[in-house]
Amino acid sequence: MACYLVISSRHLSNGHYRGIKGVFRGPLCKNGSPSPDFAEKKSTAKALEDVKANFYCELCDKQYHKHQEFDNHINSYDHAHKQRLKELKQREFARNVASKSWKDEKKQEKALKRLHQLAELRQQSECVSGNGPAYKAPRVAIEKQLQQGIFPIKNGRKVSCMKSALLLKGKNLPRIISDKQRSTMPNRHQLQSDRRCLFGNQVLQTSSDLSNANHRTGVSFTFSKKVHLKLESSASVFSENTEETHDCNKSPIYKTKQTADKCKCCRFANKDTHLTKEKEVNISPSHLESVLHNTISINSKILQDKHDSIDETLEDSIGIHASFSKSNIHLSDVDFTPTSREKETRNTLKNTLENCVNHPCQANASFSPPNIYNHSDARISECLDEFSSLEPSEQKSTVHLNPNSRIENREKSLDKTERVSKNVQRLVKEACTHNVASKPLPFLHVQSKDGHTTLQWPTELLLFTKTEPCISYGCNPLYFDFKLSRNTKEDHNLEDLKTELGKKPLELKTKRESQVSGLTEDQQKLIQEDYQYPKPKTMIANPDWEKFQRKYNLDYSDSEPNKSEYTFSANDLEMKNPKVPLYLNTSLKDCAGKNNSSENKLKEASRAHWQGCRKAVLNDIDEDLSFPSYISRFKKHKLIPCSPHLEFEDERQFNCKSSPCTVGGHSDHGKDFSVILKSNHISMTSKVSGCGNQRYKRYSPQSCLSRYSSSLDTSPSSMSSLRSTCSSHRFNGNSRGNLLCFHKREHHSVERHKRKCLKHNCFYLSDDITKSSQMQSEPQKERNCKLWESFKNEKYSKRRYCHCRERQKLGKNQQQFSGLKSTRIIYCDSNSQISCTGSSKKPPNCQGTQHDRLDSYSIEKMYYLNKSKRNQESLGSPHICDLGKVRPMKCNSGNISCLLKNCSSGPSETTESNTAEGERTPLTAKILLERVQAKKCQEQSSNVEISSNSCKSELEAPSQVPCTIQLAPSGCNRQALPLSEKIQYASESRNDQDSAIPRTTEKDKSKSSHTNNFTILADTDCDNHLSKGIIHLVTESQSLNIKRDATTKEQSKPLISEIQPFIQSCDPVPNEFPGAFPSNKYTGVTDSTETQEDQINLDLQDVSMHINHVEGNINSYYDRTMQKPDKVEDGLEMCHKSISPPLIQQPITFSPDEIDKYKILQLQAQQHMQKQLLSKHLRVLPAAGPTAFSPASTVQTVPVHQHTSITTIHHTFLQHFAVSASLSSHSSHLPIAHLHPLSQAHFSPISFSTLTPTIIPAHPTFLAGHPLHLVAATPFHPSHITLQPLPPTAFIPTLFGPHLNPATTSIIHLNPLIQPVFQGQDFCHHSCSSQMQQLNEVKEALNVSTHLN
């Protein structure tokens, strides 16, 4: 029977949906054989299944039986939608996966990048503390290792390599970097200096080792990835927690470098003499050139080479110290590279010793010149003195231009260093033993304002006051100018060195004597090499090291008069480029840049000069303690600054105004000074090479010497340095002359520092300190080498005011006018030794001293006069040579004498500068009167004489006020002056350019006038930068008014412009300027037409300045300023820049961009306000009559002088405006002439507390030019002081009541509207009584002027 089988499977064998059920009928064969039709059925079913399978949609999971149905489905929206969704899901999934993986990768990359950045920041912060960008990573790593005492003793090679790589870039350090080395690490520079001495037993390295070291060019070393110290961003305000940390903050390598520098001398003298000679022979001039080109890399290599040989010898000694010592020795050994390498070595040794001393005695300010750092041990100081003497001798031998002589000199110096090294060994051993615990750190532990949080602050961000106890203050690193801080540190170190050198004059003298000839040629050669090549930026990395280098750069400068002097000043100015070897920077950037063609000539001249000056230098060595290598010129220069006896000599010179050769009061002053003149002459030449008046300055060094000595003689201390400066500056008219002057002034600045008058860099200016200052200033000089030529005004303004960069910019501008400004700075120097150095040293001083800036102005003014006199070839007069040349010498002598005397009594620098300025200003008034009345053609001689007398009178009367102003904020308002200086400089630049024909008496006179103006500005700078600007403007206004006296119409315009600026900027500033406050506004206010004419006719004005000496001068300045309103505004902006932060201590500085923006904003706001006020004033002014200020000039004035500090300027201007108005009302023909008649009798000397300096701007004391003993204990901030508005009736009516025109009265009444805020002034002294007194004095002055009219 057939079975019926129902197949229920819904799917085919292939998995396709079957959808049909087949019923198979038929008998089932028992045998299983299929029925006959089974095959057919099977095939049919299979075909159906296949067909149906073809109609199955997997995506939609649908089975279609018909082809058309299937096609319809495939084309349907549902099917397409599902397809899209499927694809989208797939894509999204893939995207998600990819994005996730990408994000993960990015996160990883970000994390890695962040880690790298952190590591970089840590290294940089450590490097900053180490002051060595060239050695950032190595310093960080090595400092950590040194501090932790982790010194791989793998034969001392690893550590040696590390330290060598850091300091010497691949130099193998001594293999013995064991616990001894660790112990000595804190006293690294000591150990470095004594490495040979202390570890003489360790210097077991044989000559084979030495040869091996020479062959070991490559070294393998590793730096720890972790940074030992990290700068905490939260540390914005802090107090010094530990002094030891400050000592440690210098990177151990840095200190080691210092120590090595010192040790170099010792080892070089003892064991490395042969090595040194060998290395001298081995190293080729091309190598030197390469070293000069790459001071960091090549110096490191040279140090490496020397290290290799010296390392082998000293390998047993402390590895790092030996390495530094070797590198230092190597530097000195390499004659062709003595400048950069020796400087580097000296700086390294200096830093090393300094650091060693720093740990034990961070607060100790007396440090031998090698130890530029303030903190030092007596023993270390001795060692440093020895080292400095040895090192300078070494350097001098290195300086020898002839390799043979260099080698011989080095041999001699090595002998000396051997002797010294023994002492140093003892001293260093003791010091190291005592100071092993302290280790150099890149940071100081400081306390945050909360009082309990200890922050690690970079050493570079810390500045220490010179007072005892030392107070450290810092600023936000974001706004911190590290180069500037280095400069400041160097200045402090220079002061210490100065003191130390004063202590050890005999040692240094003897050593220098033996070293002068030795280093001369080598240093000259090195200087020339450096001069030829771009300045390496390695040397300046460490401020101490730079200081050390600078000291020896000064030596080098002496060796190479042009380059050396230039280098010195450039280095001083080069503080801005602390990473470049000081002397290298100066000579290379400025001299090489400017006088590459004349380089060889300068070099030759330097060699000849050095050879000719060696004897003088040797003589100077006896007298000059700290400048063994500064050969005669610097010796002489330094001799004067040699703190103890030099100060005395300076005083003595002040008494003996006439002996130019007795500048330092030293036995060899004549000879040395004449040599110095030659040196300065050459140096100035090389420095002026860029300016194009190199030869002009060369001819004048001797004459300048006379002037210099005369100016030095004028004042007890200040005069001495002034004369040095004057001779150097005048004959050089360049940074070199400034350098010389600066050294003397440095010495005097020590004096002043003692007087508390100059607590800043001035104090460093003792001989050794001068050296150190030069060393640290050399970067400044290098940066501002051009400034040296023209930085007098601008450098100070910028340097003091804000930044080395500003200063450098100014320097660039001022370079063109270096000669003129140098002379003026010389007179400033007479006013104040530090300022006296011209701007050469002032850049560093600017940081610390407003007096310096003021002096810089004065000196610049003097320099203008000097230049004019030089042009007249009246260089015979000692002190007043330059002024005397253009004008009767007595004018300058009197002015400078007055200045010096005033300065000597009080803040000599400020008073002198003010006095000189004041003298010139009244002189101008008198001259203008004479010229206007008599219209005599004796412009040159008459102007000179009249200027001399008038300057004195003016100094007594109007300038006394500036003096007062200047003295008041002597420590506070540095920045204000620089801007004024900038403006003045701008005008002065024009003046100088116009007086590119310096011989032209007219130009000289105009320069003289400008000088006076600047002096006044400098004066005000101390008190208020605004005051400064005002005084400066007053002087110029007086000169303008006087000049316009010839034409009543012109006078009326100037008066209007003059008075208007006062109206605009005259907030009640009772103490600022009693009667005449020249205002930068005034410059702007000056008749645009007239000003433009004056500017356009600047040269003519220079000529007419003979007729209108002061007026012409001021006019030329103002006219130039007015001629180019943009320039005037720029200048005013600069003034504002300097004025706005003047009272704030420089250490707290903002970036130049921030300062500019801030100042611009303030200027705009104040200009707007003043425009409104001026519009009101102008409305009233017409009633004043013809003498009233013209609206045009007033309008001009307003925009010119708006600034944050303008309120102060306004106050001063209002006063000056009222005075001018009264004067103009009384006599339109000579409005300013009335001011100058004021005599000192009108102003009684007033002494103020430390806070009063800011308040005193208008005090009679300042007006009288009496020295005020004002010391700013703390930086003054604008918030600290707000001038109390005086009742218009109380202030102005009393002062101007009888003399004021209606317009003037109205303007004066507007004064209260402007509330002068003296950033650094304390109003306790700005009492109504003092204001009334000042008003009365101004009244008297006005009366006198009226009588004169």
Curated annotation (Swiss-Prot):
Keyword field contains Zinc-finger: yes
Disordered: region residues: 985-1010
Start-end of C2H2-type zinc fingers: 55-79
Keyword Zinc-finger belongs to the record: yes
PROSITE patterns: ZINC_FINGER_C2H2_1 (PS00028)
Highest taxon in the source lineage: Eukaryota
A single Gene Ontology CC term: nucleus
The protein's name: Zinc finger protein 804B
Entry keywords, A to Z: Metal-binding, Zinc, Zinc-finger
GO molecular function: zinc ion binding
Source organism per UniProt: Homo sapiens (Human)
InterPro entries: ZnF-G_patch_domain, Znf_C2H2_sf, Znf_C2H2_type
Residue ranges the record marks as coiled coil: none
